[in-house]
Regions:
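Cysteine-centric redox/oxidoreductase cores and disulfide-bonded domains
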Residues: 117-189
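Extracytoplasmic thiol/disulfide redox context detector
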Residues: 2-119
Length: 189
């Protein structure tokens, strides 16, 4: 009788282990299928049909960490610290970007974007291109475009100077000055 109880307990344990393994596999498959972002990223085709909004003048505020600054006078100041490749920064932009842009365009806040490059060389190129777009008065649109096409893999080779120039062109930044600035790394310090 003891042998039969032990055998029954072994079978129960075996079934519990099999069920747990299957649960892990099914969970993995579900997250793999449904956890992917349905929006195309890592491709500038996500910018098809994008229209530039009116230019907004910004300055480079070297006293506050070389921030791209939209100074709207003595009102609330918001500092945004970000890296173009940072996935959490993309989440922040997706959640707050339109609100920040409305504060800027309606002159309700001074917003300073500190575009950093803590995730590698591709971040340096994308940050440089962001400053080049700011020189054209089109930082807000370029900033939005960067996060719209952000690759899901950091330092994937996506952020080449050619891709950054094409992104600018795709959204309407077509000046030779922008292209030259991006390709020459003119804003890299």
């Amino acid at each position: 009788m003891a042998k039969q109880a032990a055998k029954s307990q072994d079978n129960t344990t075996r079934w519990i282990v099999v069920a747990m393994v299957l649960l892990v596999i099914v969970t993995g498959v579900v997250f793999s299928l449904f956890g992917q972002n349905s929006k195309e990223t890592g491709s500038i085709s996500a910018l098809d049909g994008y229209k530039l909004k009116p230019a907004v003048t910004s300055t480079i505020d070297t006293e506050n960490g070389s921030a791209i600054t939209f100074d709207n006078g003595p009102v609330t100041t918001i500092d945004v610290w970000e890296d173009p490749q940072c996935p959490v920064c993309k989440f922040f932009e997706d959640a707050n970007g339109e609100y920040l842009e409305s504060l800027i365009r309606e002159k309700k806040a001074t917003v300073r974007f500190h575009v950093l490059s803590f995730l590698g060389d591709e971040s340096v190129r994308a940050a440089n291109a962001s400053f080049c777009a700011a020189d054209e008065g089109q930082f807000l649109d370029f900033h939005k475009a960067i996060y719209a096409v952000q690759s899901q893999v950091e330092n994937s080779g996506f952020w080449s100077n050619d891709t950054l120039v094409k992104m600018g062109q795709k959204i309407g930044i077509t000046s030779p000055t922008f292209e030259s600035c991006v390709k020459n790394g003119s804003k890299v310090d």
